[in-house]
């Protein structure tokens, strides 16, 4: 099981639905928490390949979101 947590800022991310669709497309479970400046995602995947694929796509769309390797 692979777990990652990342935060988004509303000034950088205008379409949170896109992030959620990408997570669902890669069969990654997620828990979203909203806060004043943005959202926090806790994502869980059974396979490392799905997580790598999602992170690669997220970096292409939103390079300003910091993600651990």
Residue ranges of model-derived segments:
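Conserved short beta-strand edge segments in small beta-sheet-based binding/regulatory domains
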Residues: 31-33, 59-69
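Short, surface-exposed ligand-recognition loops at beta-strand->loop->(often short) alpha-helix junctions
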Residues: 3-15, 47
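Acidic, low-complexity, intrinsically disordered interaction modules
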Residues: 16-51
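Charge-rich, low-aromatic oligomerization/scaffolding segments with amphipathic character
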Residues: 50-62
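A general secondary-structure signal for short beta-strands and their flanking turns/coil
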Residues: 1-3, 38
